[in-house]
Amino acid sequence: MPTINQLIANPREVQKSRKKVPALQQSPQKRGVCTRVYTTTPKKPNSALRKVAKVRLTNGFEVIGYIPGEGHNLQEHSVVMIRGGRVKDLPGVRYHILRGVLDTQGVKNRKQRRSKYGAKRPK
């Protein structure tokens, strides 16, 4: 337990909370360019080939973004929009790529939750 004089000389430091999405820098979304598009496997007990992309953002950060939905048209040099939101079974993936924005096409034949996947209303 410090003395009063010690506290006057060296006040207590407030612990800063760790940011969950530091690369966004307080923005809701950020734009970036895909540097690598690949698949990766999730942690136990799940099994799949999850589609992810390494993205270089406009602010210089390089992050890994998850590509949601079935099928995608992304390749290297595609311009994408990224939002926060981690994927629980993929370590290091703390961002989602937005579908139907910039170079990313929406999911085909999507009937429900279309706005999440950038799909137009079916006729």
Curated annotation (Swiss-Prot):
InterPro entries: NA-bd_OB-fold (IPR012340), Ribosomal_uS12 (IPR006032), Ribosomal_uS12_bac (IPR005679). One of its GO terms (biological process) is translation. The modification 3-methylthioaspartic acid is found at residue 89. It comes from the Bacteria. One of its GO terms (molecular function) is structural constituent of ribosome. Keywords: Methylation, Ribonucleoprotein, Ribosomal protein, RNA-binding, rRNA-binding, tRNA-binding. Gene3D superfamilies: Nucleic acid-binding proteins (2.40.50.140). Residues 9-32 are annotated as: Disordered. Transmembrane segments: none annotated. Pfam families: Ribosom_S12_S23. One of its GO terms (cellular component) is small ribosomal subunit. Part of the 30S ribosomal subunit. Contacts proteins S8 and S17. May interact with IF1 in the 30S initiation complex. With S4 and S5 plays an important role in translational accuracy. Belongs to the universal ribosomal protein uS12 family. This is Small ribosomal subunit protein uS12. It comes from Bradyrhizobium sp. (strain ORS 278).
